[in-house]
Regions:
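Electropositive, surface-exposed helix/loop patches at the edges of structured domains
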Residues: 126-137, 231-250
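Short, well-ordered alpha-helical segments in soluble proteins
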Residues: 145, 149, 161, 189-192, ...
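Mid-to-C-terminal catalytic subdomains of enzymes
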Residues: 184, 188-242, 269-277, 281, ...
Length: 337
């Protein structure tokens, strides 16, 4: 690929380089970088640039291609993708999973795929890189808006996340477009796999027989928005996710300060979250105990000492968004997940 690639390859390479450098600066050099590789344009562009960038840092790349066993020929396709990754310089793995969980084939396949990637990451001792792009972010924001969501949900896909098992999930291409990943593949002469399950008329359907919701948003809602607004809505939707992430972080910081009893820090955080505050009437109507019961129901627990330990006057006087987060944080510190 060379030290100074051009065009779409350059855009992908710079994004991956910045992400991996940031990870190494914070966590140190890992044993390997694990890349989820379906063979589609996004994951293929990620893999080829990650292999190049990681090799310069002396770190192996392990690609994981998951065969869900849901299509005729999927096992052969997974092997072809793994063979390509091996030729590109990765240590290529294929994993066959069983898709039989609740929530339909799409959700079950996603959970099985995540579990497989997590297992490899824990074994290899490195983070997982995923090929989500700005379009994926925009689609997620729209899907969550349709459910009626607040900032915790509308922050959508996190560029970096550490899960409860200690695995770090990185999405270096979240600021790039699908045109960038497709262009990168074309530049380096790679032909991506076309997955028919992603098509609006693909074999996987929603429970009512209609297209899968994400496919409907991708091929229906976003083009319709572009036509109606006379503009590409994807960057604005992605920006909404970033703004909600900043708001959610501020509210969560305030809530944690309340739980820790750091009243002065909480007061200093008030300005950052003032736009989310309830009016006095709203505060009066909702008691801390009622909200604690709601949060307890969400996590499948009883209201106990974890709620009683809160400084009630401080928490009741906070905006609702902060109260909810304070209660969740108290539950977490009380050992409830």
């Amino acid at each position: 690929m060379g030290a100074n690639p051009r065009g779409s390859v350059r855009a992908c390479s710079l994004a991956v380089r910045a992400c991996l450098r940031s990870f190494i600066d914070e966590a140190g050099v890992p044993s390997a970088f694990v890349v989820g590789l379906s063979g589609g344009a996004d994951s293929l562009a990620l893999a080829v640039t990650a292999i190049d960038v990681a090799s310069r840092a002396g770190v192996d790349v392990v690609t994981v291609t998951v065969d869900h066993g849901l299509r005729v020929g999927s096992a052969q396709e997974a092997r072809r993708v793994a063979d390509l990754a091996s030729r590109l310089g990765a240590r290529a793995l294929t994993v066959t999973v069983s898709v039989d969980g609740p929530g339909g084939p799409e959700a079950s396949a996603r959970e099985a795929r995540i579990a497989a990637l997590r297992e490899v990451a824990l074994r290899e001792g490195g983070p997982v890189l995923l090929g989500h792009t700005m379009e994926d972010q925009a689609e997620t924001v729209l899907l969550r808006l349709a459910r009626g969501s607040g900032p915790s949900s509308l922050r959508a896909i996190a560029p970096i996340r550490r899960d409860e098992d200690g695995v770090t999930w990185l999405r270096p291409l979240l600021g790039l477009r699908r045109a960038d990943t497709a262009g990168a593949c074309e530049q380096v002469g790679l032909t991506p796999v076309e997955d028919p399950t992603n098509a609006i008329d693909g074999p996987w359907r929603a429970a009512d027989g209609s297209a899968l919701r994400r496919s409907a948003v991708r091929y229906g809602a976003i083009p319709a928005l572009a036509d109606a607004l006379g503009m590409d809505p994807v960057p604005a939707l992605a920006r909404t996710a970033a703004l909600c992430a900043a708001d959610d972080d501020a509210l969560t910081s305030w809530a944690r300060a309340l739980v820790a009893g750091e009243r002065e820090q909480a007061a200093n955080s008030a300005d950052a979250a003032a736009h989310a505050a309830d009016g006095p009437d709203g505060m009066a109507r909702e008691t801390l105990r009622d909200r604690a019961q709601d949060v307890a129901s969400e996590v499948g627990a009883e209201v106990g000492e974890w709620a009683s330990s809160l400084a009630v006057a401080d928490v009741v006087g906070a905006p609702r968004a902060v109260r909810t987060r304070a209660l969740r944080e108290a539950a977490r510190r009380g050992g409830i997940r």
